[in-house]
């Protein structure tokens, strides 16, 4: 179902766990100045979009509509599939820690975060 909520709420219990917005072409942004996040953004090869969303949602809100309004496909040799598994995992943990250190996170969300880490390790075979 569609929903609207405060960005911080989305960060604390959803984006804490993983990037739930895999298709940046499905996102509509307000006119923003990214100069405040630009340097930190450059540190990420895999999770840059995730970091960007968290930075935006710290100050804004999110509306989610599950209707397929565009299409997203993943190619066999996409960055997501070919990037080093350890680097991928480390950036996910780095983003989770970034969020955990800056926001109030409840115990259930923390448990989901650690469960996702276990799942990701198995998925990436590391």
Segments from the language model and where they lie:
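Low-complexity, flexible helical/coil segments
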Residues: 17-22, 63-64, 97-109, 125-126
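Short linear sequence motifs
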Residues: 37, 43-46, 65, 96, ...
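Conserved nucleotide-sugar donor-binding catalytic segment
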Residues: 2-86
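Non-catalytic, C-terminal membrane-associated alpha-helical segments of glycosyltransferases
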Residues: 84-94, 110-126
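Residue-identity detector for glutamine
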Residues: 12, 40, 94-96, 125
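Generic detector of well-ordered alpha-helical segments enriched in charged/polar residues
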Residues: 12-16, 100, 112, 116
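Catalytic core of nucleotide-sugar-dependent glycosyltransferases
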Residues: 72-76, 81-107
């Amino acid at each position: 179902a569609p929903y609207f909520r405060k960005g911080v709420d989305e960060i604390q219990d959803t984006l804490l766990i993983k990037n739930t917005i895999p298709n940046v072409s499905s996102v509509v942004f307000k006119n923003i100045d990214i100069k405040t996040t630009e340097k930190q953004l450059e540190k990420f090869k895999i999770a840059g979009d995730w970091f960007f969303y968290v930075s935006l949602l710290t100050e804004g809100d999110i509306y989610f509509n599950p209707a397929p309004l565009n299409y997203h496909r993943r190619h066999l040799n996409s960055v997501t599939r070919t990037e080093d598994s350890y680097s991928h995992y480390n950036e996910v943990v780095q983003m989770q820690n970034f969020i955990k250190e800056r926001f109030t996170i409840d115990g259930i969300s923390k448990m989901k975060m650690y469960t996702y880490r276990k799942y990701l390790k198995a998925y990436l075979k590391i």
